[in-house]
Amino acid sequence: MNPKSNPDTIFSAPIDKIGDFTFDERVAEVFPDMIQRSVPGYSNIISAIGMLAERFVKPHSNVYDLGCSLGAATLSMRRHIKQEGCQIIAVDNSKAMVERCKLHVNAYRSDTPVNVIEADIRNIDIENASVVVLNFTLQFLSPEDRYVLLEKIYAGLRPGGILILSEKYVFEDQVSNELLIDLHHDFKRANGYSELEISQKRSAIENVMRPDSKKQHKERFAQIGFSSYDVWFQCFNFGSMFAIK
């Protein structure tokens, strides 16, 4: 059920001047291959997002996929949602991603409607939500915008609603942090990426993706008022957390 893509060769040749990473047409074309080969445990996270949605979704409520890219989490949730009167609102600010996401969503029939929107997730109203997903999205916002968005999500969640937040993590202990970075690079090598590709991708993304520690995430959840929160999945320095209102 996952969308197919061309192989990711974006960083395979030397680039004289490496610009900041953007989710443009080139990335959208190879995104499924890129993320499977770059994010350890990605398929497990996508599958479990559907299971969590099935458990937490309420009838006549909204489900949000903020930073939906090609719609993998949206499709996983839609397959699991059995409640009446629900809709999924999938949002991304990349025109190329949104266009492809609509094609993927429309390729499968479902009783749960999906509204795919091209917009900045910071400007989206969160209302009557039982499930909100931020799947490797928050880390691309400026640090000052993260708290504001999470506050908005909390306000728009129904009591008992869940936020699913997948992120890359930094670790406060330097030895642990370096080991997990090295293991992630080993993972990418095992998936066919060259040293040049790993190095150039890192240079392109380091200015636009600034990950937090698990402690920082938990402190934000507590300050905002979530009643329960924890890590439910981790592989190397990538993982996913839940926060329940």
Curated annotation (Swiss-Prot):
<dbReference type="GO" id="GO:0002098">
    <property type="term" value="P:tRNA wobble uridine modification"/>
</dbReference>
<keyword id="KW-0949">S-adenosyl-L-methionine</keyword>
<keyword id="KW-0808">Transferase</keyword>
<dbReference type="GO" id="GO:0016743">
    <property type="term" value="F:carboxyl- or carbamoyltransferase activity"/>
</dbReference>
<protein>
    <recommendedName>
        <fullName>Carboxy-S-adenosyl-L-methionine synthase</fullName>
        <ecNumber>2.1.3.-</ecNumber>
    </recommendedName>
</protein>
<dbReference type="GO" id="GO:1904047">
    <property type="term" value="F:S-adenosyl-L-methionine binding"/>
</dbReference>
<dbReference type="InterPro" id="IPR005271">
    <property type="entry name" value="CmoA"/>
</dbReference>
<feature type="binding site">
    <location>
        <begin position="67"/>
        <end position="69"/>
    </location>
    <ligand>
        <name>S-adenosyl-L-methionine</name>
    </ligand>
</feature>
<comment type="similarity">
    <text>Belongs to the class I-like SAM-binding methyltransferase superfamily. Cx-SAM synthase family.</text>
</comment>
<dbReference type="InterPro" id="IPR041698">
    <property type="entry name" value="Methyltransf_25"/>
</dbReference>
<comment type="function">
    <text>Catalyzes the conversion of S-adenosyl-L-methionine (SAM) to carboxy-S-adenosyl-L-methionine (Cx-SAM).</text>
</comment>
<feature type="binding site">
    <location>
        <position position="42"/>
    </location>
    <ligand>
        <name>S-adenosyl-L-methionine</name>
    </ligand>
</feature>
<feature type="binding site">
    <location>
        <begin position="92"/>
        <end position="93"/>
    </location>
    <ligand>
        <name>S-adenosyl-L-methionine</name>
    </ligand>
</feature>
<dbReference type="InterPro" id="IPR029063">
    <property type="entry name" value="SAM-dependent_MTases_sf"/>
</dbReference>
<feature type="binding site">
    <location>
        <position position="135"/>
    </location>
    <ligand>
        <name>S-adenosyl-L-methionine</name>
    </ligand>
</feature>
<feature type="binding site">
    <location>
        <begin position="120"/>
        <end position="121"/>
    </location>
    <ligand>
        <name>S-adenosyl-L-methionine</name>
    </ligand>
</feature>
<comment type="subunit">
    <text>Homodimer.</text>
</comment>
<dbReference type="Pfam" id="PF13649">
    <property type="entry name" value="Methyltransf_25"/>
</dbReference>
<feature type="binding site">
    <location>
        <position position="202"/>
    </location>
    <ligand>
        <name>S-adenosyl-L-methionine</name>
    </ligand>
</feature>
